[in-house]
From Swiss-Prot:
One GO BP: photosynthesis
Pfam families tied to this protein: Psb28
Membrane spanning stretches: none
Assigned keywords, A-Z: Membrane, Photosynthesis, Photosystem II, Thylakoid
Protein name: Photosystem II reaction center Psb28 protein
GO cellular component: photosystem II oxygen evolving complex; plasma membrane-derived thylakoid membrane
Family note: Belongs to the Psb28 family.
Membrane topology field: Peripheral membrane protein
Subunit note: Part of the photosystem II complex.
UniProt organism field: Prochlorococcus marinus (strain MIT 9303)
Keyword match NAD: no
Name of the encoding gene: psb28
Highest taxon above the source species: Bacteria
Keyword Thylakoid part of the UniProt annotation: yes
Length: 117
């Protein structure tokens, strides 16, 4: 796994960036104040047997600081871990704006784009 050195990174163990880039889906309430981001990491490196037990949450790091969620769930196929599903919830417009600033930095670091469906 890569050591932390990007402008924006996701970590499951502090100090170790997860190199697998997730699929991210956003949903918002009708008034736009609350919502969630669902991250799906297919075959993330953190699911290796030697690191699996060290997951305590997902940490989104950038120049402004850190966003944290503890809602991390594993998906298994035929008894083997295959993916991580992580939910980040925001409860105010300010929280959403902060998340979007992180998301834009993370996208820029990983060559990602944004599309509305």
């Amino acid at each position: 796994m890569a050591k932390a050195n990007k402008t924006a990174a996701i970590q499951f163990i502090r100090g170790v960036d997860e190199p697998v880039v997730p699929d991210i889906k956003l949903t918002r309430s009708s008034d736009g104040r609350t919502g969630r981001a669902l991250f799906v990491f297919d075959q993330p490196e953190i699911m290796a047997p030697e690191t699996w037990a060290g997951i305590t949450g997902m940490f989104m790091l950038d120049e402004e600081g850190e966003l944290v969620t503890r809602e991390v769930n594993a998906r298994f196929v035929n008894g083997q871990p295959s993916a991580l599903e992580v939910t980040y919830i925001w409860k105010s417009e300010e929280d959403f704006e902060r998340f979007m600033r992180f998301a834009k930095r993370y996208a820029a670091c990983n060559g990602l784009g944004y599309s509305q469906n």
